[in-house]
């Protein structure tokens, strides 16, 4: 008799639990939210301000896809770093030195020659003809930024156990051998992020098996389609481009040196895919960054770009607040 009574009570408890859950959710299930962070160099600081507003409005993020520095911000966010953590990171880092593989031990020296490479104020500027070719020149190895990313991932909130689970994350790179887009979602996250931001002509490509990978902005700078395939029902996309190029005019007019290449990667991705992707986002956020560019990593500019991002997030506060309610089903 006691045995049957125990089973009966358990069934009642289970039933009440299900009823309570349905009552709390109003019989609706929450859609899966995908976050897309486009590339844009220093301008990606604006995305951090927008992330702050997502957190304030308690918008859950179930999937993340990013390109170039958007992959770095997205990857770290997926590993449990929050917007405040990322803001401190952006404010405290000397990004130009980090990205340029600058040897900080040589900063105080105007001229230094080491292993056949000539440095000015710590920056590699010329390789002698008889120098070891493996030292590289005009092709930054990206060792500093890789080690930096690897250290951040290895001691992330997820790895330390303060955040239970990582958010599923994918980033986009471009295989220069086969001339095609590659989506990276397995293996070393630091390596994947490093591949996604390997600017052609500036950074050494990242080799994974037979793939030779460079910056994903070559093929897909706003990977809305990628996060959809991951399983997102609705997509919030943060686009840092200021030129939309709908008319396809003068496609290579501003390719002038490395600065032009950086601009091209930030402003001239695969045009057809980009124009489709930005219209496929459920919530498309494009902060007005004025004249700030991809290389504006100085402290004053970063502070201003972060503020623009926060102000943009505030402008979208009402939309974000209603977002989940409107999309529940």
Sequence positions of predicted segments:
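Positively charged n-region of N-terminal signal peptides that target proteins for export
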Residues: 1-4
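Bacterial N-terminal signal peptides
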Residues: 6-15
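Patatin-like phospholipase
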Residues: 20-67, 75-329
């Amino acid at each position: 008799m006691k045995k049957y009574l125990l089973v009966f009570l358990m069934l009642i408890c289970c039933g009440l639990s299900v009823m309570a859950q349905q009552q709390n959710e109003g019989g609706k299930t929450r859609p899966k939210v995908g976050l897309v962070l486009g590339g844009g160099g220093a301008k990606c600081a604006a995305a951090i301000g927008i992330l702050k507003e997502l957190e304030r409005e308690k918008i859950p993020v179930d999937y993340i896809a990013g390109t170039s520095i958007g992959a770095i911000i997205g990857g770290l966010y997926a590993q449990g770093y929050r917007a405040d953590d990322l803001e401190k990171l952006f404010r405290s880092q000397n990004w130009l030195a980090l990205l340029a593989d600058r040897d900080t031990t040589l900063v105080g020296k105007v001229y230094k020659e080491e292993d056949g490479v000539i440095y000015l104020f710590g920056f590699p500027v010329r390789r002698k003809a008889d120098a070891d070719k493996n030292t590289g020149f005009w092709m930054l190895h990206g060792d500093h930024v890789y080690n930096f990313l690897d250290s951040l991932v290895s001691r992330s909130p997820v790895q330390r156990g303060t955040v239970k689970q990582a958010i599923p994350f994918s980033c986009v790179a471009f295989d220069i051998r086969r001339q095609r887009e590659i989506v990276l979602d397995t293996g070393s996250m630091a390596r994947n992020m490093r591949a996604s931001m390997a600017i052609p002509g500036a950074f050494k490509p990242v080799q994974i098996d037979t793939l030779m990978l460079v910056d994903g902005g070559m093929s897909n700078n706003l990977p809305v389609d990628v996060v959809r395939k991951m399983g997102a029902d609705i997509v919030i996309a943060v686009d840092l481009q200021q030129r939309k190029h709908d008319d396809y005019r003068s496609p290579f007019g501003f390719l002038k040196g490395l600065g032009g290449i950086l601009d091209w990667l930030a402003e001239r991705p695969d045009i057809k895919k980009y124009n489709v992707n930005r219209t496929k986002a459920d919530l498309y956020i494009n902060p007005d960054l004025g004249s700030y560019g991809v290389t504006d990593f100085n402290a004053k500019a970063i502070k201003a770009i972060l503020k623009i991002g926060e102000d943009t997030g505030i402008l979208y506060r009402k939309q974000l607040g209603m977002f989940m309610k409107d999309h529940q089903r």
